[in-house]
Amino acid sequence: MYLEAFLDYLKLERNYSAHTILAYNADIQTFFNFLQEEYQIDNPKLVEYVFIRAYVVHLSTRELSHRSINRKIASIKAYFKFLQKVGKIQISPLLKHKSLKIKKEIQIPFSPSEVNQVIENLSKSDAFEGKRDYVIISIFYALGIRRSELINIKISDIDFSSHVIKVLGKRNKERLIPMIKWLEGLIEEYISLRARTWGSNHSPYLLLTNKGDKLYETFVYRVIIRYFSEVSQKTKISPHILRHTFATHLLNNGADLNAVKELLGHSSLAATQVYTHSSIAELGKVYKNAHPRNLKN
């Protein structure tokens, strides 16, 4: 199947994270399991587009969202594109495949009062767990980083003299993000408590679980759910919403879109615009203050 060669390509040439590579591997393995069961095919050279369509129908019967199906098919498409690139097949069976349409959802950020309430509640804790959760949420809100970026922050990535944190983004791209004084002081307090709890040399990673291990994605997700479900009525709560909140609150307070783009680690301005969302009240304020007819009254 040349799968190992493809996974090595993702790791060595595309600099994909281990988590992403595992997802690609699972998607491709599941696809070929389907082909083996339904058509007794295990050779990628025998795969035709009709089998791709059949697999899409199969995934649809499992009540997966169009977004999830598209992601799985994208993994398979990348695999066949690689096979074509290295000369194992002449043409990809997904060459003319079109993704399923996705209903666009407006992601509503948390309000400043919701974020402030969570931060206020957590600021009262002196225990390791509460202080760590306080730092997790504060870093998300103050820096707008991704969940994977937060998990991989090392103590050595924090430069208190220059007031910046180094984060490792997608495809191992590094960027420096300035720290505001409030966050800097909070992290210093946490590091001191962490040293008293686990010892100074216990782990290179800044944030640890209750057992002293490196954080993992589900753990971080649960932390966000736990605290924001207490103050928000939103049906969708996630670390990504906090990243969205970071961008929106900066823009609503006059930050330049290009500056926010750099802080988020986006390569294009279009990607940043997806994260922005002004409230109706904010839009109304801008509209009333800017419209020529309103200025005359």
Which residues make up each language-model segment?
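Conserved catalytic core of the tyrosine transesterase superfamily
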Residues: 1-297
